[in-house]
Amino acid sequence: MKRRRSAKKSPAMVTVTDWKGLDCGEETRIVRRLMKFEDLPEYLKDNEFIHNHYRCQWSLKDTFLSAFSWHNETLNIWTHLIGFGIFLWMTVVSCLETTEISLAGVFNGMAGVRICLSSNQTLLHDSNVTHHISCLTSQGEAIPKWPWLVYLVGAMGCLICSSVSHLLACHSKRFNVFFWRLDYAGISLMIVASFFAPIYYAFSCHPNFRLLYLSSISILGLLAIITLLSPALSTPRFRPFRANLFLAMGSSAVIPATHVLCLYWDHPNVFIALGYEIATALSYFVGATFYVSRVPERWKPGAFDMAGHSHQIFHVFVVMGALAHCVTTLLIIDFSRASPSCGF
């Protein structure tokens, strides 16, 4: 008598109508398809004005491969991934070049700016700094490069955490909670890192103030990360709170910036650096405004699902602000090198 072969039980195929009430911990094999907002589990419902093209609990392999497919997170992933590539390029150049760091390849293509850290050059080779910014040699001790690298690494950390979070947070509830916390930690890291280079170089003659400012922003960043570890603060309801927290951290730069102006008010080049820093602040502020208001998708729900929604615009402004801050930092390095004595 022949025994019937017992077929292996195949994983359950979950259709779009089965999502409501689904336990994300269940072992399920999900059809790789894009979902509508109303069919998502609660933890994936972040923006009700984006109606379609959601990934939901895809396999890890499919989730990784979705970086190369078209859905409502594609541009969120790539806007910051491209930004990461730009900062990685600058980091490699900064580490490899011993006498000169040229950022012409990045800034010539974006704003016609050429920035370098070199020797035996004039501070402003061209009066129009948006087209050409040069730097002077240090007539004394070599200026340390590590604060500049701290900023580059912090920016890269923020951008790659953001890209990976947008890519993988849809895989499961556990991934969702973990990666959005990682994303917020990355933002805090970038804010703290952005303080290091300008403060280190600007207060080279005032080590006590330098220590005070760097310690203060580091403590604020640590407190922000601890605060945002709360799962409740990762929910859409606290979107304004998160934006205001990050803006408050960034706004604290007003204090050391004002201090620098008081110390070096008679140096016109300081005001050039300040102009770029104002551009940085405006970029972050405008980006945060889009992030909180969820414009333009709020005005026409469903029309900006794939491209043009607020979070994508927010990402673009973050990268623009980070690049403007690079110019500020390199200008401050130039000023520090140009000085025949301590500081500027």
Curated annotation (Swiss-Prot):
Cross-referenced Pfam families: HlyIII
Residues exposed to the Cytoplasmic side: 1-76, 169-184, 232-244, 291-312
Tissue: Expressed in roots and flowers.
One cellular component (GO) term of this entry: membrane
Transmembrane regions: 77-97, 148-168, 185-205, 211-231, 245-265, 270-290, 313-333
Membrane side Extracellular: residue ranges: 98-147, 206-210, 266-269, 334-344
Main location: membrane
Location of this chain's protein in the cell: Membrane
Topology in the lipid bilayer: Multi-pass membrane protein
Presence of keyword Transmembrane: yes
Gene Ontology process terms (BP): response to hormone; response to oxidative stress; response to sucrose
Task performed by this protein: May play a role in abiotic stress response.
Protein name: Heptahelical transmembrane protein 3
Species of origin: Arabidopsis thaliana (Mouse-ear cress)
Lineage per the UniProt record: Eukaryota, Viridiplantae, Streptophyta, Embryophyta, Tracheophyta
